[in-house]
Amino acid sequence: MPRSVNAVASRARRKRVIKLAKGYWGRRKNAWTIAKNAVERALQYAYRDRKAKKREFRRLWIQRINAAAKMNGLSYSQFMGKLAASGIELNRKVLADLAMNNPEAFKEILKKVA
């Protein structure tokens, strides 16, 4: 009996990986083993960095809020504490956007919490 190999599934799997490797440099885009390794590593980086992106943006928003608050005589922690105590429920993303693009509105919020 001849050896049974599922060539259709194997070819589909290889095509999928080679398609994901499109745009890579050198043999990474067309040599099966090298492309497989490159795509696997790229997917690991993508997974890791989707998580890191959330942390990085939070850090950026905090830095922007801190800079705007310090220009008005408050530290970040003092500002956030007073914001929570006053019952204003704005998240860091919105506060950072206001601090950057609409400083007058941010100053109004500072006046309300102080």
From Swiss-Prot:
InterPro entries: Ribosomal_bL20, RIBOSOMAL_L20_CS, Ribosomal_protein_bL20_C. Keywords: Ribonucleoprotein, Ribosomal protein, RNA-binding, rRNA-binding. Belongs to the bacterial ribosomal protein bL20 family. Disulfide bonds: none annotated. It holds the Pfam family Ribosomal_L20. The keyword Secreted does not apply. GO terms for molecular function: rRNA binding; structural constituent of ribosome. GO terms for cellular component: ribonucleoprotein complex; ribosome. This is Large ribosomal subunit protein bL20. It comes from the Bacteria. The keyword Transport does not apply.
